[in-house]
Design a protein with these regions (language model features):
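Intrinsically disordered, low-complexity terminal regulatory regions
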Residues: 1-85, 89-147
Length: 147
């Protein structure tokens, strides 16, 4: 990532980097709730389900600020079920890129929810792995751009 990141992204990415050891990715369990307090409302956990062409992304946890930005709570839902078909590639591509590269991915986007606030959002996607190698979850921080 070449562009400068907002301070919150720098901090959470710094924590993620500290937990990457010997080429292994951190696991979800490396981020207990009490260590996530500064970012709690802006955190989303997304699970990678399946493999190959059948990979889907299920939302496991959604912070309260993200619910506000999106205008709904997507906990337990698959992203491809809530994203309009004409926007799926744009919204899901950063998750694929993050899983393939095993590296953080930043992007800016507009929510596709009709109930969402009408402003640009920024997202940092960090890969997580229970075995240290295979990406099985993502720690996602989402903030309103320009705030």
């Amino acid at each position: 990532m070449s562009q400068p990141l907002r301070a919150e992204f720098e901090a959470i990415q710094g924590r993620w980097k500290e937990l990457c050891r010997n080429g292994h990715l951190p696991a979800r369990s490396d981020f207990p709730a009490e260590t996530m307090t500064p970012w709690m409302g802006h955190i989303q956990i997304v699970e990678r389900v399946g493999d190959g062409d059948s990979v889907r992304h299920r939302v496991r946890l959604v912070g309260t600020r993200i619910v506000y930005y999106e205008g709904r709570d997507n906990t337990g839902l698959f992203l491809d079920d809530v994203i309009p078909i004409d926007q799926r590639d744009e919204i899901l591509e950063p998750y694929r890129r993050c899983a393939d590269s095993r590296a953080p991915v930043y992007n800016a986007f507009y929510s596709c929810s009709e109930a969402a606030i009408s402003s640009q959002l920024e997202r940092l996607i960090l890969p997580l792995s229970a075995d240290g190698k295979t990406v099985d979850q993502f720690l996602v921080a989402i903030y309103r751009a320009g705030t």
